[in-house]
C-alpha cells in the first residue's frame, strides 16, 4: 500500500506541488519515484445512468467497439485513475473514428500507467484481440536486448534500401500524452534531454525543439523520415495528444542521424536506430546499445521507464505494448508485390506491409515498408530475427520470380515463442 505522501506525488498533484518547490526537485525525480505508482481506484458520480451515456458503436470497426459491452461500460464508466483519467477519455478516439478501411485499429488509448489496471476489464480483451491471442491476465512478456544473438542480419542491398528499428518508452510517474498537463509534458522533455546529454561516442548528438524550427526545416526532416509528421492523425487529435502543439516537442539525434529520439509525440519518447542499406544487424546493435544507455542515464537521475511483466513496456496505444518494437526495411519487390500469394506469404511470416511513406501511402517504384506484426509475447531479439528471416525469404522469392521460377507460401510461424 502506498503512503499518503506517495499518493500525493502522483500525476497532476505532483506537478502542482513540484511547481511550487522549484525545478531542482523535478530534475532529480527523486521523490516521485521512491515507490511504484499505486492504481488507487476512485469513483466519480455522474448525473445520468451508464445506459444514457453508452456510445453508439453499431457502425464501428475497431477493437474497442468489438470488446466494449453495456455491462463493461456500466462497471467502468464512473471509475477514475489517480490522475483523473476516465473510461470515456480512453475510448473517445475510437468513438470518433469508427475504423480504418484496411487496418483494424485499436480504438482506445491510456492516459496514464494506471489506466491499464483501472480499466483492465476493457483493456485486457482489447489487448488480446489486437495481439492475436496474447492474454495479459495469464501470460508474461519477456525482454531481450542482446544483439549478438542475431544471425544473417545483412540483406542484399540490390533489394533492401534502408533498415530501421524503433520502440517507445514512457517515464513512470508522469501522465501519458493524452492526459498530461503542460508541466508534465515539459518535464518529460527536461528529463529526456538532460539524460541524452550524457550520450558519448557515436551516440553523441544534440536536441532540436520543434518550436524553434522553421517550417522548411520541419518539412525536410519529415520528408527524410527523421521527424514525426504534423499532428493531423485522428489518433493524436481525438485523443488529446495534439494539445499545445508544438510546446515541449522535439527531436534529438546523433551527428550521423542514425540514432534518434522523438519527444512528446504519441509517446513520451520514441527511440529509433536507422541507416541506408541492408545491415539490420548493425542497426539493431546500435538500437540495443543506445536504448540501454538512455535507460541508464535516466535511472541515474532518479527516474525509470514504465514496465510490468504482464504488459512489458507501457505505452499510450495498446498496439505498442510489450516491446513497442517495430523493425522494418524499405525493400523493392516489383514482381512479388504483384503476385496473388504476396499477402498470404506476409501473413505466414508474421510480417506486414505499408506503402513507401508508411500507413495510408502508396508504394513508390514498387518499394514497400515491411515490418513485424507482433509487439508482445516475443522478445526484441525474436522479433528482429523474424523480420530478418522473413525479408530474406521475400528477396529470395523476388529472385526466383525474376528467373521465371515458382515460389511457395511458407508454413505459418507460431505466434508466441518457440513451439
From Swiss-Prot:
One further remark on this entry is: Mitochondrial creatine kinase binds cardiolipin.
Which CDD domains has this protein been placed in?
creatine_kinase_like (cd00716)
Which portion of the chain is the transit peptide? Answer: 1-39
According to the UniProt entry, which residues carry Phosphothreonine?
356
What name does UniProt use for this protein?
A: Creatine kinase S-type, mitochondrial
Q: Which PROSITE patterns match?
A: PHOSPHAGEN_KINASE, PHOSPHAGEN_KINASE_C, PHOSPHAGEN_KINASE_N
Instruction: Say what the protein does.
Output: Reversibly catalyzes the transfer of phosphate between ATP and various phosphogens (e.g. creatine phosphate). Creatine kinase isoenzymes play a central role in energy transduction in tissues with large, fluctuating energy demands, such as skeletal muscle, heart, brain and spermatozoa.
Q: Provide GO CC annotations from the record.
A: mitochondrial inner membrane
SUPFAM superfamilies for the chain = Glutamine synthetase/guanido kinase (SSF55931), Guanido kinase N-terminal domain (SSF48034)
Q: Which cysteines are joined by disulfide bonds?
A: none
The gene coding this protein = CKMT2
Domain Phosphagen kinase C-terminal as annotated: residue spans: 159-401
Q: Which is an annotated Pfam family here? A: ATP-gua_Ptrans
An example Gene Ontology biological process: phosphocreatine biosynthetic process
Q: Where is the Phosphagen kinase N-terminal domain?
A: 46-132
The UniProt family comment states: Belongs to the ATP:guanido phosphotransferase family.
Query: What broad class of enzyme is this?
Result: transferase
Q: Does the keyword Transit peptide apply?
A: yes
